[in-house]
Structures are given as structure tokens and as C-alpha cells.
């Protein structure tokens, strides 16, 4: 089963890290990522650009409203994600805990994925 690990943290804090601090966190995460890859669990990994680069589309009106910036103002922002192929939720949680030990602060949300393949859609 595939799981998404959604990585939330305080964007202002993370983007205030020095290059050395950021490189250390990324190197520590890379150790865990290599382990997950060797186990055949690691799928796509992405670090999102700052929320200032986001565009939000409000669909509660016609026509939809396109706005600069994130959908909501929150204490923590979605800063990245992992896609993992795990046997069960417990295995995905263990991977998230291991990633969390390498990354200070924030929180991880583990969520099962339902994959839709375009080739399987009716014409």
C-alpha cells in the first residue's frame, strides 16, 4: 500500500536556517532516504517552494478566483512530502518516525493513498 508522509513545519523557522544547518538536516534525511530506497519503499520525495510561491484557486464562486499565496494562514505549512510503499500503516508510521528524528520540529501526517491511473479510466 502506498502512503503519503506530509511534512509540516514553521516555514519562517526552516527558511531562516543557515546553509550549514539546512545541509545538515538534508544530509541526515538522506541517510534515512537511502535506507528506505534500499528496502524498496521510497517513492517520489519533494521539498516544496515557499508558500509565497503558491497560487490558490477558490472554487466557491463562478468564475473561480485565482489568488497569490497559500490557501490558509497557519502556524505550520506543508513544506514537503514523501510517497512510500509500505506493507501497512504501522510500517509507514515507523518510517515517518525515523524521518522525524532526522528533521527538527514540525509534524508529519501519514495518509494512505488511493492511486488513479489514467489508463484505467473509462473513455
Task: Describe the role of every protein-language-model region.
Residues 1-123:
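Conserved, structured core segments of small domains
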